[in-house]
Amino acid sequence: EAQESERRQAEFAERTQLFMDTMNVDEMVAQLLVAEGFTNLEEVAYVDLDELTSIDGFDQSTAEELQARARESLEEINAKAIEHAKELGVEQSLFDFEGLTPQMIEALAEDGIKTLEDFATCADWELAGGYTTVDGKRVKDTGLLEKFDMSLEEAQTLVMNARLQLGWVKESDLAKEEEAAEAGDEDEEQA
């Protein structure tokens, strides 16, 4: 219980610092955002204004300014990520692929994934993270996109969409696999 409390306090402090650094707000404003459940710039930048104005002390003008700062900061971060990814040799096919942010593309490029073809060869757990057993012990594998809160399901969908886009699989193949999986589930239920 003490460890959990320490973890939450560290997370709170980390998020507070993130907002202070990226949005140029004072500690009190940053703490209010974190206390209200905001965890990243995207949430502040694109949340409905009513959610911000419902916070004690935040009027319409303050909420609009916070969103403007968050969006401006995101644009700067995205531009730097794109520039770095290009320096690393990322091909346009990966930039054009829907579902990956510039920061995700940068993280992939840092690991040598620079084309849509490279991305399509990834396993879901390589992106989202997971656990494997090594010498009888359960070991955590950190996913390349885990820091972006990527779930296994999201990773599966993105990889499958890349494979579809490249023509490696067809929609009809996926439909057949789904039907077979559903039939297998029904067989298990009847047993």
Give short role names for the model-derived ranges.
Residues 1-191:
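C-terminal extensions
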